[in-house]
């Protein structure tokens, strides 16, 4: 079974669009782009366009790659104090001379719709309400819930321990809640008996950032696979490349129980979760 994210994301976005159309003022999303990374340009443009299509006010704030930390913090402070802005997103990766932790911590937790501020991460780990969940981990859980794939009591192997996906996803999956409550193993490059552990997993979430890393001999026949990765791999087609995930889809798809495609799986859901967080921030500011 294919776990397609696009139709699920479209349903979420359509509901948001209806709610926004009935609101007295539009939610505002500010996207900060530092430098001229081509992939980041595409992602920022897509997020701004999606927000505007929903009826939000959205703008990309571009700074040069040699922007100083002072310049960036001044911009974030201005956005923090702007009552028409309800969500602030700093596009990652950043130029090497910048510390992403300092920049993320400068964002008001109430406007941190990416869910990466330490305050929101802390609430997530403690299972407290009121914070924002990181968009990609939230997308993974939303997608599994939509397709009625139970998590409670199941063994979920998360491959990758990044602050953006792996760590927060593990924390969310283990929460004592009817939609999660899973037994979680977090695997990484130093994990011993990697394949043996992976084969015991009911659900595998691949978020390691290595193209085609998960092979068919590493999974059990009844595993559900969620592929978070997306990479460009050079090919001889007209584009000169193709998009692939962290899972060797063509060989794994015939063996596993269900799998997300790349593209069209987790990606659209991540954007939908960003818009959902922005709407929730708007609601909180209006109450």
From Swiss-Prot:
Enzyme Commission number(s) of this protein: 1.5.1.5, 3.5.4.9
Pfam families given in the database record: THF_DHG_CYH, THF_DHG_CYH_C
Keyword flag Disulfide bond: no
GO-annotated cellular components: cytosol
Annotated CDD domains: NAD_bind_m-THF_DH_Cyclohyd
One GO BP: L-histidine biosynthetic process
Residues that hold NADP(+) according to the record: 160-162, 189, 230
Keyword field contains DNA-binding: no
Record-linked PROSITE patterns: THF_DHG_CYH_2
Catalysed reactions, semicolon-separated: (6R)-5,10-methylene-5,6,7,8-tetrahydrofolate + NADP(+) = (6R)-5,10-methenyltetrahydrofolate + NADPH; (6R)-5,10-methenyltetrahydrofolate + H2O = (6R)-10-formyltetrahydrofolate + H(+)
Pathway: One-carbon metabolism; tetrahydrofolate interconversion
Keywords, ordered alphabetically: Amino-acid biosynthesis, Histidine biosynthesis, Hydrolase, Methionine biosynthesis, Multifunctional enzyme, NADP, One-carbon metabolism, Oxidoreductase, Purine biosynthesis
InterPro entries, A to Z: Aminoacid_DH-like_N_sf, NAD(P)-bd_dom_sf, THF_DH/CycHdrlase, THF_DH/CycHdrlase_cat_dom, THF_DH/CycHdrlase_CS, THF_DH/CycHdrlase_NAD-bd_dom
GO molecular function: methenyltetrahydrofolate cyclohydrolase activity; methylenetetrahydrofolate dehydrogenase (NADP+) activity
Superkingdom: Bacteria
Assembly description: Homodimer.
Record family assignment: Belongs to the tetrahydrofolate dehydrogenase/cyclohydrolase family.
PANTHER family: C-1-TETRAHYDROFOLATE SYNTHASE, CYTOPLASMIC, C-1-TETRAHYDROFOLATE SYNTHASE, CYTOPLASMIC-RELATED
Role noted for this protein: Catalyzes the oxidation of 5,10-methylenetetrahydrofolate to 5,10-methenyltetrahydrofolate and then the hydrolysis of 5,10-methenyltetrahydrofolate to 10-formyltetrahydrofolate.
Protein name: Bifunctional protein FolD
């Amino acid at each position: 079974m294919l776990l397609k994210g696009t139709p699920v994301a479209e349903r979420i976005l359509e509901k948001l669009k209806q709610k926004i159309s009935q609101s007295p003022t539009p939610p505002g999303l500010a996207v900060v782009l530092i430098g001229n990374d081509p992939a980041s340009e595409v992602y920022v443009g897509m997020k701004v366009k999606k927000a505007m299509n929903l009826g939000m006010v959205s703008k990309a704030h571009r700074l040069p790659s040699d922007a100083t930390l002072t310049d960036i913090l001044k911009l974030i402070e201005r956005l923090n104090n702007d009552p028409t802005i309800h969500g602030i997103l700093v596009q990652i990766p950043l130029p090497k001379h910048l510390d992403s932790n300092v920049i993320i911590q400068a964002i008001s937790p109430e406007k941190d719709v990416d869910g990466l501020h330490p305050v929101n991460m802390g609430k997530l780990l403690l299972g407290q309400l009121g914070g924002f969940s990181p968009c990609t981990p939230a997308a993974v859980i939303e997608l599994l819930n939509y397709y009625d794939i139970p998590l409670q009591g199941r063994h979920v192997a998360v491959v990758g321990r990044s602050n953006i996906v792996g760590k927060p996803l593990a924390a969310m999956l283990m929460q004592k809640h009817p939609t999660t409550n899973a037994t979680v193993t977090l695997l990484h490059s130093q994990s011993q008996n990697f394949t043996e552990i992976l084969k015991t997993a009911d659900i595998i979430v691949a978020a390691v950032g290595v193209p085609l890393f998960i092979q068919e001999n590493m999974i059990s026949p009844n595993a559900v696979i969620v592929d978070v990765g997306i990479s460009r791999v050079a090919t001889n087609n007209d584009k000169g490349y193709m998009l692939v995930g962290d899972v060797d889809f063509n060989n794994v798809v015939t063996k596993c129980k269900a799998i997300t495609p790349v593209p069209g799986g987790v990606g659209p859901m991540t954007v939908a979760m960003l818009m959902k967080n922005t709407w929730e921030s708007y609601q909180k500011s209006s109450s």
